Amino acid sequence: MSHLAELVASAKAAINEASDVAALDNVRVEYLGKKGHLTLQMTTLRELPPEERPAAGAVINEAKEQVQQALNARKAELEGAALNARLAAETIDVSLPGRRIENGGLHPVTRTIDRIESFFGELGFTVATGPEIEDDYHNFDALNIPGHHPARADHDTFWFDATRLLRTQTSGVQIRTMENQQPPIRIIAPGRVYRNDYDQTHTPMFHQMEGLIVDKNISFTNLKGTLHDFLNNFFEEDLQVRFRPSYFPFTEPSAEVDVMGKNGKWLEVLGCGMVHPNVLRNVGIDPEVYSGFAFGMGMERLTMLRYGVTDLRAFFENDLRFLKQFK
């Protein structure tokens, strides 16, 4: 008890000298721990007469409280200093030049699809989709493609079994739309299609977009005008366009569409035709009342022509040196 004031003074001095929270905690243990100097003072109470013990205990507790308050104050001071130091170290120098954020870009084929969808959207076409794993009815039979047609051969088509396959065209979307919707119909059907072929101008998977209009009094003139306007818009120039007679099982008459290239040669860009009456009958539409036209085009081919790409496979190799050109 006689050294109590000295212990408090010694504790406060040690507290003030503590340079961090860890050192401060060592001081706390030294003076207020289970075997601390001030804690042990309580054991001296047994040496005092019973009537003096309460007053002496109060004095010891007061000394411990002074030390605890000093500990709390110093801890707050040290923590505040540490926080200020950390904030100072993390301060952002706004005068430093910023780091440039690298912007991404759309894949060139995606850019082509978006551009075509935008054009036909302004003409009132809606986008329709369908399954990539198709049955032979929607991929072939309903489209007036007979069983002996070469497209059904194993070397041209990826078959799962006798009736299921990876679709070879998005025409099945047209069939499903006509099965579930009465005319007037005006859709485009973009999507992935699959054919067993791989070379400089063919890949096993590629993107196709087909269009379909079914309504009363639709003529080949409507088809020609629509596609002529589309091609001029897509290539952003007034093109020389020709419609060359062709054959597709699902259209009659049918045509291939060519544009005159800068080298003075005709370039094939898409196929089209008037919807075959048998196709309309297959989906329950009366060909005596309604007519329509359809067209189909490869997205990769149009992208190659628009941007001057010579190898179709470049679209699938993910070479950033190639893709960065289209940002």
From Swiss-Prot:
<keyword id="KW-0460">Magnesium</keyword>
<keyword id="KW-0648">Protein biosynthesis</keyword>
<dbReference type="Pfam" id="PF01409">
    <property type="entry name" value="tRNA-synt_2d"/>
</dbReference>
<dbReference type="InterPro" id="IPR002319">
    <property type="entry name" value="Phenylalanyl-tRNA_Synthase"/>
</dbReference>
<dbReference type="InterPro" id="IPR006195">
    <property type="entry name" value="aa-tRNA-synth_II"/>
</dbReference>
<feature type="binding site">
    <location>
        <position position="252"/>
    </location>
    <ligand>
        <name>Mg(2+)</name>
    </ligand>
</feature>
<dbReference type="GO" id="GO:0004826">
    <property type="term" value="F:phenylalanine-tRNA ligase activity"/>
</dbReference>
<keyword id="KW-0030">Aminoacyl-tRNA synthetase</keyword>
<dbReference type="GO" id="GO:0000287">
    <property type="term" value="F:magnesium ion binding"/>
</dbReference>
<dbReference type="InterPro" id="IPR010978">
    <property type="entry name" value="tRNA-bd_arm"/>
</dbReference>
<keyword id="KW-0547">Nucleotide-binding</keyword>
<dbReference type="Pfam" id="PF02912">
    <property type="entry name" value="Phe_tRNA-synt_N"/>
</dbReference>
<dbReference type="GO" id="GO:0005737">
    <property type="term" value="C:cytoplasm"/>
</dbReference>
<keyword id="KW-0436">Ligase</keyword>
<protein>
    <recommendedName>
        <fullName>Phenylalanine--tRNA ligase alpha subunit</fullName>
        <ecNumber>6.1.1.20</ecNumber>
    </recommendedName>
</protein>
<dbReference type="InterPro" id="IPR045864">
    <property type="entry name" value="aa-tRNA-synth_II/BPL/LPL"/>
</dbReference>
<comment type="similarity">
    <text>Belongs to the class-II aminoacyl-tRNA synthetase family. Phe-tRNA synthetase alpha subunit type 1 subfamily.</text>
</comment>
<dbReference type="InterPro" id="IPR004188">
    <property type="entry name" value="Phe-tRNA_ligase_II_N"/>
</dbReference>
<comment type="subunit">
    <text>Tetramer of two alpha and two beta subunits.</text>
</comment>
<dbReference type="InterPro" id="IPR022911">
    <property type="entry name" value="Phe_tRNA_ligase_alpha1_bac"/>
</dbReference>
<dbReference type="GO" id="GO:0006432">
    <property type="term" value="P:phenylalanyl-tRNA aminoacylation"/>
</dbReference>
<keyword id="KW-0963">Cytoplasm</keyword>
<dbReference type="GO" id="GO:0000049">
    <property type="term" value="F:tRNA binding"/>
</dbReference>
<dbReference type="InterPro" id="IPR004529">
    <property type="entry name" value="Phe-tRNA-synth_IIc_asu"/>
</dbReference>
<keyword id="KW-0479">Metal-binding</keyword>
<keyword id="KW-0067">ATP-binding</keyword>
<dbReference type="GO" id="GO:0005524">
    <property type="term" value="F:ATP binding"/>
</dbReference>
